[in-house]
Amino acid sequence: MPDLTPFWISIRVAFVSTVIVFILGIALARIMYYRKSKWTHLIESIVLLPIVLPPTVLGFLLLMFFSVDHPVGHLLTDILGIKVVFTWVGAVVASVIVSFPLMYQHTVQGFRNINPRMMNTARTMGASERKIFFKITLPLSKRAIISGTMLAFARAIGEFGATLMIAGYIPGKTNTLPLEIYFLVQQGREHQAWLWVLVLVSFAISIIGTMNMMNQERYREVD
């Protein structure tokens, strides 16, 4: 019977990071959609940076940012007692950083695909911006938000480079599935690594299949 600890650590890290990304992604998408300014493109470029930056670069930046020598790391570790580096919290932080752009991108695109005349009509009828957002914008962007959430969760499950840099490989604490596969191969235990490889491949196929089914349903509705 294989040790399921890496599986449950990955699920916990991915779940917590996805909840955070879900909330922050929708919040930022709403701000960027409703409050366009000259800074919009710059902010979006910064948000999307984790997509193109190497994971090791992200991990290095996070390691420096949360180290005790940095003001933020000092505040969290020495004053608030929250240790990020080489803990599962660090794995969550890494997963949030790498998966956030996917959630944001899908959500804001879902908002932009809505016909603005629907919201303008609601405004002329006296609906508040808050009511428009919760009654029109969110429901009509449901598929985009679900797709973004699924991709964010999948990205968090598969995160390796940044997690290795900031959380390290600590059995029973930070050994997520990608890290476990890497170190099993390093130890010459490829037959054990195959189990987790098949788990991740099956998970990825199920995510992609579900998203394709959702897209097909959307196209049928349009037709």
Regions found by a protein language model. Name each.
Residues 39, 108-124, 194-223:
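C-terminal transmembrane helix and the adjacent membrane-cytosol boundary/short C-terminal tail
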Residues 1-5, 166-205, 209:
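Interhelical loop and adjacent transmembrane-helix boundary motif
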Residues 35-43, 71-72, 129, 143-144, ...:
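Membrane-helix interface segments
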Residues 24, 46-55, 82-108, 139-143, ...:
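Faces of alpha-helical transmembrane segments in polytopic inner-membrane proteins
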Residues 59-96, 167-170:
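Membrane-interfacial helix termini and adjacent extracytoplasmic/periplasmic loops
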Residues 1-19, 35-37, 81, 185-190:
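Periplasmic/extracellular loop-to-transmembrane helix junction in inner-membrane transport proteins
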Residues 16-47, 60-62, 110-113, 118, ...:
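Transmembrane-helix boundary motif in ABC transporter permease subunits
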Residues 19, 104-107, 111, 115, ...:
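Transmembrane alpha-helices
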